[in-house]
Regions:
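N-terminal secretory signal peptides and thylakoid transit peptides that target proteins
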Residues: 1-18
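Residues at or immediately preceding the N-termini of alpha-helices
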Residues: 7, 48-51, 99
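C-terminal segment of N-terminal export signals and the immediately downstream linker at the start
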Residues: 24-52
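Short, glycine- and small/hydrophobic-rich beta-strand elements in well-ordered beta-sheets
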Residues: 25-30, 62-88, 120, 127-132
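Short, well-ordered beta-strand segments in beta-rich or mixed alpha/beta enzyme
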Residues: 35-44, 81-106
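Surface-exposed, polar helix/loop patches in the mature regions of secreted/periplasmic/lumenal proteins
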Residues: 94-133
Length: 133
């Protein structure tokens, strides 16, 4: 095998490997962008007596088209442990098909109305967004 032939073989192998790794990287990138999203919200109430009113408001969010699942909760009566935060009043867990679905939720009129009509009930809100892996 001469140098010219070896060089051609090397170049064609390099091209094939590069194309393969690029395709694999694109596939992984696309997979990451399309993973389901969990949107976890914790509300600290100004007045504990307003808990049911906030729960009613939170439940209006299930009408948003991009919401796939909704779970509303209150502090569980589980064993008290140092690592468990029981200072919040109402929790909300929403699932979306992807980041675009969660972004659409943020600007949906139902969500905007919820914030406008119920934000006076809480003095603190903390949100955790997680991408499913």
């Amino acid at each position: 095998m001469n140098n010219k032939s070896s060089r051609r073989k090397f170049i064609s192998t390099a091209v094939i490997l590069t194309a393969g790794s690029t395709t694999m990287a694109e596939t992984l990138s696309m997979k990451t962008k399309n993973n389901k999203i969990a949107h976890q919200v914790y509300f600290w109430l100004k007045n504990p007596e307003d808990r049911q009113k906030l729960i009613e408001g939170v439940n209006t969010l299930k009408k948003i088209k991009t919401v796939r699942q909704i779970h509303v909760g209150i502090v569980a009566g589980t064993e008290k442990r140092e690592v468990i935060d029981t200072s919040w009043g109402v929790s909300l867990l929403l699932f979306f098909d992807d980041i675009a679905g969660e972004a659409s939720y943020q600007t949906d009129p139902i969500h905007l109305d919820f914030v406008k009509n119920y934000s006076n009930l809480w003095n603190k809100v903390v949100i955790y967004d997680a991408e499913m892996v």
